[in-house]
Each structure stands twice: as C-alpha cells, then as structure tokens.
UniProtKB/Swiss-Prot annotation:
Interacts with KDR. Interacts with TXK and ITK. It is found in: Cytoplasm. The gene is SH2D2A. It comes from Homo sapiens. Induction: Rapidly induced after activation of T-cells. However, the gene continues to be expressed in long-term cultures of activated T-cells. Expression limited to tissues of the immune system and, in particular, activated T-cells. Expressed in peripheral blood leukocytes, thymus and spleen. Much lower expression or undetectable, in brain, placenta, skeletal muscle, prostate, testis, ovary, small intestine, and colon. Expressed at low levels in unstimulated T-cells, but not expressed in normal resting or activated B-cells. According to PubMed:10692392, expression is not restricted to activated T-cells, but strongly expressed in blood cell lineages, the endothelium and other cell and tissue types, such as heart, lung, and liver. Residues 245-256, 352-361 have a biased composition (Pro residues). This is SH2 domain-containing protein 2A.
Length: 389
C-alpha cells in the first residue's frame, strides 16, 4: 500500500501509521506475510518505484531487466487462471487496461476526480494492481489470490470470489489506512487491453477445454490433394505451410510367371563309378591265422618263397622230392620295411621234372602255388629271411 509492510498495524486496529511511501515496497517480510496468509500470487521480481507523497509527479518506474520474461509469465497465468471468469463473451471489462505502466496509469488518472480507478497488470509480480486517484496522488495496491481462488487487497481481510465483487465492495467500504473509497472506473479507449489479444486467448482456452487430447498432424494419402489447414478461431489468418505429399515410390519390375513356376535345376555331382575289379573277394574256405594281414593293405612283395613236401610223386623214387616254387606278386599284400622275403630249400635228390599243373582258382591273396591243404595238415611253413641261394 502506501507504507512498508513492516508498518502494517495488527488486524482490527484502526490506528494509521505515518505514511512514508506513495506505494509500499516489497521486502522479505512481505513474502513471509503472503505465505502466512496463504496467498498464491507470485513474489515480485523488482519493487514498485517509490515516490514521496508530495512529489508524486516525479516518480518514474523503470522496468527490470526481466520485464519481457515477466510479461510472458503473466500472459500465461492470465490465460490459464483468469481469462475464463474475467472475459465475458470475449470482451474484457472496461476498467481492465492490461499491460500499461505505472507512469501511464498515473497520467490517465491525474485529471480524473477522486476515487476514479483502474486495474492493470503489475510490472514487478505476476498479479493485478489496483490504481486509484486519491486526494493528493495516485495510489497502487497489489491484489493477491488466496489458495481457494478468492481475491484480496494485499494486507486487507475482505476476500471475494470475483474481481468485480472486490471492486464493488470497496466502493462502499473504505480502504485502510486512509479511509478512501472507490467511485467510478476509468474506461479504456482501446477495444482490447494493452498487450493482450482476447480473440486468441479465448480461442485457445475454448479449444483446450473442448479437446483436452493433444493435436496430431493429419495423414494425407497419395493421390489426394492436400487440404489447407486453418487454426481454430483464426478467421482471416492465412494458413501456415501446406503439407506436401511424399513422392510415389517406384514400382518393382514385373517378371514373367515362368520365373516363379519353373524351378531352376541345381547342378549335382555325378556319383563315383564303382570299380570293376574289387580289391578283394571273400574266400570260400577260412584262411589260417598266420596268413591274414593286419591293417590296410600296402604294397605287394615282389616274391614269396615257400618249400612244401609234395606227396603226389611216385613212390619208386625212394626219397621225398622238393621243388622250387616261384610265386607271383600278391596284389594288395603287405610289404613291411620294403624288404623281400625269400625262402629256398635244398634239393635232396634230383628227379624228373614234374609236369606244370595250373593252380586252382583260389579266391584269396595267397600265391596260387601254395597248397592250402599241406599248410593245414602239416602246419609247417618255413619262411626264411634273406635272398635265395
């Protein structure tokens, strides 16, 4: 008000302290007082410019460095919390002047009679300011809003649901500590309050109340002409940029149906031909244990010498006859260490040469001139190592 908050007398007391300022100065005690009273008005960022009661015309309010930022906050606060009840059919009351400075408000009220008033936005806090013409100067009162939404003059007890009701109350009840009342409002000369676009504010508030869901950009199908989008309530405003459809995606080349129906033959390796002559044949009779090889067959030895007794000679010779037998290389035989096995038996007696008998068709890997029966009966086979003599 017109004195520091530290000089506010206890509520219920009508003793007025000596005024020292034409408008009260915001201090830390003011913030504590607002918290104790439950006010929701924002704390001021810069104090109202002070002036002496006798030199009101010399007071000049210098906006702080954050004035543009403060105006943006005030505009957002007004749109969210005050516009729905203050605006009537999209029009603001005549006594609300919006963003006008303290100096301009004093210039407008200077020629007016005592008690003439107006309401404006504060230059130091996010709230309203009541400015009226007193007997000697113009006085400025900050208006606060309680947690329940009621409006009060900062430092007063009377709280009201609407700002219009608060102004009407002080036309009949004086404002302490000076005992001055309000008489008539000062109507503004502009159709809208300064710094506010009521059409935009009302349309934004209406769109948010009707459609609380977030807005999404429409999807335009290919082949359809884009429809110009206009903002709700914009009226004569030009639409912003039109949405451009994306270029069509080139189609893939079509292939003949034969490509999909006829499978491509795959190259498969030819099976290996089976050998005409097998490596070995199954014998008709079992083979003796010492004649059976172990492991995989290696290279065949060049010669194998075996001496056997021949019982088919005539008995007139009187002595056994041994003959030298030369065997052919055995296919698939083993050759241990690359050495050749030779055997030779001395001839006890010489007899007439025996006729050559073809070997029987044996299906085994032993030499053809080896008598299996002799090996089985006598079980004697001398296989000496070393070259033949």
């Amino acid at each position: 008000m017109e004195f520091p908050l530290a000089q506010i007398c206890p509520q219920g007391s009508h003793e007025a302290p000596i005024p020292t300022f034409s408008t009260f100065q915001i201090t830390d005690m003011t913030r504590r007082s607002c918290q104790n009273l439950g006010y929701t008005a924002a704390s001021p960022q810069a104090p109202e410019a002070a002036s002496n009661t006798g030199n009101a015309e010399r007071a000049e309010e210098v906006p702080g460095e954050g004035s543009l930022f403060l105006q943006a906050e005030t505009r957002a606060w007004f749109q969210k919390t005050q516009a729905h009840w203050l605006l009537q059919h999209g029009a603001a009351p005549a006594w609300f002047h919006g963003f006008i400075t303290r100096r301009e408000a004093e210039r407008l009220l200077e020629p007016k009679p005592q008690g003439c008033y107006l309401v404006r936005f504060s230059e130091s806090a996010v709230t309203f300011v009541l400015t009226y013409r007193s007997r000697t100067c113009c006085r400025h009162f900050l208006l606060a809003q309680l947690r329940d939404g009621r409006h009060v003059v900062l430092g007063e007890d009377s709280a009201h649901a609407r700002l219009q009701d608060l102004l009407l109350h002080y036309t009949a009840h004086p404002l302490s500590p000076y005992g001055e009342t309000l008489t008539e409002p000062l109507a503004r000369q502009t159709p809208e309050p300064a710094g506010l676009s009521l059409r935009t504010e009302e349309s934004n508030f209406g769109s948010k109340s009707q459609d609380p869901n977030p807005q999404y950009s429409p999807i335009i199908k290919q082949g359809q002409a884009p429809v110009p989008m206009q903002k709700e309530g914009a009226g004569e405003k030009e639409p912003s940029q039109l949405l451009r459809p994306k270029p069509p995606i080139p189609a893939k080349p079509q292939l003949p149906p034969e490509v999909y129906t006829i499978p491509v033959p795959r190259h498969r390796p030819a099976p290996r031909p089976k050998p005409s002559n097998p490596i070995y044949n199954e014998p008709d009779e079992p083979i003796a244990f010492y004649a059976m090889g172990r492991g995989s067959p290696g290279e065949a030895p060049s010669n194998i010498y075996v001496e056997v007794e021949d019982e088919g000679l005539p008995a007139t010779l009187g002595h056994p006859v041994l003959r030298k037998s030369w065997s052919r290389p055995v296919p698939g035989g083993q050759n241990t260490g690359g050495s050749q096995l030779h055997s030779e038996n001395s001839v006890i007696g010489q007899g007439p040469p025996l006729p050559h008998q073809p070997p029987p068709a044996w299906r085994h890997t032993l030499p053809h001139n080896l008598s299996r029966q002799v090996l089985q009966d006598r079980g004697q086979a001398w296989l000496p190592l070393g070259p033949p003599q």
